[in-house]
Amino acid sequence: MAWQVSLLELEDRLQCPICLEVFKESLMLQCGHSYCKGCLVSLSYHLDTKVRCPMCWQVVDGSSSLPNVSLAWVIEALRLPGDPEPKVCVHHRNPLSLFCEKDQELICGLCGLLGSHQHHPVTPVSTVCSRMKEELAALFSELKQEQKKVDELIAKLVKNRTRIVNESDVFSWVIRREFQELRHPVDEEKARCLEGIGGHTRGLVASLDMQLEQAQGTRERLAQAECVLEQFGNEDHHEFIWKFHSMASR
């Protein structure tokens, strides 16, 4: 018999209908549907009474639920060595598989089904992570554009500073030559003019130096922000969403 089911499709079929994560301690109800043991306990508080199946709504005896050994064996066989344990909800101890769009926080399937996030718009963590990474890419692009603008500003300031200094040198040389011809009768006037040009030049250069220093500081901060954004992209889904949401809210 040929098998044509991809690993991703198989993983989708091995998910608990309640928490939307791969089965953990799966139990099979009398109706044939399987759920995580923790999900069933959270749904009915205990398994010694009648349980209504969330899939077919058939009322079955919870105490007759047996471990789905075959399903557990398949999941264990497909599990990659070294897979990290998923982060779990502090209320239901189920994997944080969903993101509440209204409250902007990670939740488990039971939080969205029965808890305080009931009826809130929710999105799978993988989808939210992809969306936020797209936002991160857009932010990264904007950062690059800002860096380009700052680089252009720095180049312009450096060019203007060089031009002003060079022009000042030329003007000073011309003035010295002219006043050398007049010698003593105009020495006082020459000194006054030179001082005026020097003072004006120092003022312009000081202003440009200040702008240059500010622009270089802005460039350094943008470079630091770029590094932070690149590090965010390497975080796991949950750390990335927590940190990205914390950064975006500031």
UniProtKB/Swiss-Prot annotation:
Entry-linked Pfam families: zf-B_box, zf-RING_UBOX
Gene Ontology biological process terms, A to Z: innate immune response
Keywords: Coiled coil, Metal-binding, Zinc, Zinc-finger
SUPFAM superfamilies with a match to the protein in the record: B-box zinc-binding domain, RING/U-box
An MF annotation (GO) of this entry: zinc ion binding
GO terms for cellular component: cytoplasm; cytosol
Recorded coiled-coil stretches: 125-169, 204-235
Gene3D superfamilies xrefs: Classic Zinc Finger, Zinc/RING finger domain, C3HC4 (zinc finger)
Zn-finger segments (B box-type): 84-125
SMART domains to which the protein is assigned, alphabetical: BBOX (SM00336), RING (SM00184)
Binding residue positions for Zn(2+): 89, 92, 111, 117
InterPro entries linked to this entry: TRIM/RBCC, Znf-RING_euk, Znf_B-box, Znf_RING, Znf_RING/FYVE/PHD, Znf_RING_CS
Zinc finger feature spans (RING-type): 16-57
Family: Belongs to the TRIM/RBCC family.
PANTHER family per record: E3 UBIQUITIN-PROTEIN LIGASE TRIM
Protein known as: Tripartite motif-containing protein 73
Organism: Homo sapiens (Human)
